[in-house]
């Protein structure tokens, strides 16, 4: 198994770990103004693309 020849510096370690952050979820508004995830049915009013698709 390969073994590191040199110790990884604190700067390189922290630079690599800075990419581990969580992404902020993208949000959109449905036609009635509720905040939803894009391309999903609104859980509050049951509409998708200005059509009623769920009975809520």
From Swiss-Prot:
Which gene holds the coding sequence for this protein? rpmF
Can you provide one Gene Ontology molecular function annotated for this UniProt record? structural constituent of ribosome
Task: Give the CC-aspect GO terms.
Answer: large ribosomal subunit
Biological process terms from the Gene Ontology for this record are: translation
Q: Which NCBIfam families match?
A: rpmF_bact
Coiled-coil zones: none
**Species of provenance:** Frankia casuarinae (strain DSM 45818 / CECT 9043 / HFP020203 / CcI3)
Family annotation (Pfam families): Ribosomal_L32p (PF01783)
Top-level taxonomic group: Bacteria
Q: Which InterPro entries match?
A: Ribosomal_bL32, Ribosomal_bL32_bact, Ribosomal_zn-bd
What is the protein's name according to its record?
Large ribosomal subunit protein bL32
- Biased amino acid composition, Basic residues: 1-20
Region described as Disordered: spans on this chain: 1-24
Q: Family per UniProt?
A: Belongs to the bacterial ribosomal protein bL32 family.
Keywords attached to this entry? Ribonucleoprotein, Ribosomal protein
């Amino acid at each position: 198994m390969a073994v590191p020849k040199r110790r990884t510096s604190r700067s390189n370690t922290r630079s690599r770990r800075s990419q581990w952050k969580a992404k902020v979820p993208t949000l959109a508004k449905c036609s009635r103004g509720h905040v939803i995830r894009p391309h999903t049915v609104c859980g509050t009013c049951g509409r998708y693309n200005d059509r009623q698709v769920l009975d809520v």
